[in-house]
């Protein structure tokens, strides 16, 4: 299979890792030869008003164990995306389509692709279901 891009990049929290996370990583890898995943640090999540169930070092290890992922780095700020795209010579930035349009500012540095989310599953939904039990 001839892939369109050489280096892909995506970012996320990846708390309570589920099939939707796996699907987006698989589809992101299908676009390129090498996939870099930035996992949001606990400190960055607190800045965004999010509290994770799983600490960042564990979330990074989980993502690193996925066969579609070639490199895992911590994400510590919003500005890091531009820095990383330049630093790693990223050809394609990949996100779920729930973020559609939010990362178009990266188009001056690389292609930006929004992939459809896996329906019926999200970390927010899982947290709500667990809270109700």
Predicted segments — roles?
Residues 1-133:
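Nucleotidyltransferase catalytic core that binds NTPs
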